[in-house]
Amino acid sequence: MTKTDVSGLSQLGTKVDLPQNPEEAVLERVPSGHGGTDFVVRFTAPEFTSLCPMTGQPDFAHLVIDYVPDGWLVESKSLKLFLHSFRNHGAFHEDCTIDIAKRLVSLLSPKWLRIGAYWYPRGGIPIDVFWQTGSPPEGVWLPDQGVPTYRGRG
């Protein structure tokens, strides 16, 4: 078993105030320790919130982020704080989704990353946003994201 170097982390194991916006949030990474092995890391945020940039009303989504590391893992507390920083941030669903994915790609330079954002209906229309960096590495197991299509009462 490899020991992960956490000496450069500023948030793990300490009390950290919630960032007020995504630009203020600090994403951190740790070495993977499993170079040469392709595997999928999944983060699920079933209660993601942001604000509508027009009305200021809350928007809710179920996020699923999958990635294949290439040397780096996102530190989960920093990811949690980053995602929570959208709580008071006004942006359209598409912008929130793509901005989250691009920040992670910039930080980690993963072999592959995808995000599925399953937004709850606004005005009677659910908006689902999907993005990925390209084709996943051959041979990795990619489970279904497991979020059913919105059906309302039906």
Curated annotation (Swiss-Prot):
The keyword Oxidoreductase applies. Substrate binds at residues 74-76, 93-94. Its EC number is 1.7.1.13. Gene3D superfamilies: 3.30.1130.10. It holds the Pfam family QueF. The keyword Oxidoreductase applies. One of its GO terms (biological process) is tRNA modification. It is an enzyme of class 1 (oxidoreductase). It is found in: Cytoplasm. Keywords: Cytoplasm, NADP, Oxidoreductase, Queuosine biosynthesis. Transmembrane segments: none annotated. Pathway: tRNA modification; tRNA-queuosine biosynthesis. It catalyses: 7-aminomethyl-7-carbaguanine + 2 NADP(+) = 7-cyano-7-deazaguanine + 2 NADPH + 3 H(+). Belongs to the GTP cyclohydrolase I family. QueF type 1 subfamily. NCBIfam families: QueF-II. Catalyzes the NADPH-dependent reduction of 7-cyano-7-deazaguanine (preQ0) to 7-aminomethyl-7-deazaguanine (preQ1). This is NADPH-dependent 7-cyano-7-deazaguanine reductase. The gene is queF.
